[in-house]
Amino acid sequence: MDEIIRNIAVFALPVLFAITMHAAAQGWAAKRFGDTSAFAAGRVTLNPLVHIDLVGTIIVPLATYLMTGFVFGWSKPVPLDFSRLRNPKRDMAWVCLAGPLANLLMALIWFVTGLLLVAANVGEEFPHKVAEAGVLVNLLLFAFNLFPLPPIDGGRILISLLPHKLAMKYAQVEPYGFFIMIALIYFKVLAYWVLPMMWLGKVAISLIASPLSFLLA
C-alpha cells in the first residue's frame, strides 16, 4: 500500500501539469486563430484546477494505475467552436496540434529537469522519479493524441488535411470514435501506434537537449 501511495504521488504532478498544458495550449491556439470560446470560459490558464475533470483527471488515472501500473487521463473538454476560426478547415489542424506539441514541450522540460537533478547530485530518489514520470506521461499523451481517429486531436488534424469530400466522410466516424478507441486499446492494437510515436518523441527531446547533456557530462 505504501508503494502504491508513493507511485501515485510520483505521477500526480506530471499528470496534472500535462493535462493543464495540453488544454491551455489548445485554448490559446484557438484564440490566436479567432475562436475565443475557451478564453471566454476561462480555460486559457495554467491553473490546473480549472482543467480538472472528475473522471478523466482523477478516477481514470487512479483506475489505470491500479489495474495496469500505468497512468493515463485527460482534462475537462476544452470548449472549441471551429466554425469561428478565421479559416476553419486549415486552422483546426493548428488548434488540435497545439495540445500534443505542448505535451512534447513538457516532456522536454521534464527531461531537462532530470538532467539538472543528476548534475546537481540530488540524492533523493523522489524528484528523479517525478522527472521520469513527467517524460513518460507527456510522451504518452503526445503519441495518443496524434492517433488519426476523431474526435482525438490526430483525427481532427487528418480531417483538416483531407480534401473536402473525404474530410466530410471521415468526420462521420467521430460519434463512434470512443468505442473504436476502446476496442483498439482492448485488443492492444493501439500500442503499434503509441510506442513508436513515443520513441520518436523521446528521440526528438534527446536531440534538442543534447547540447545541455554534453555540457553537463
Regions found by a protein language model. Give the residues of each.
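Hydrophobic transmembrane alpha-helices and their immediate loop junctions
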Residues: M1-A217
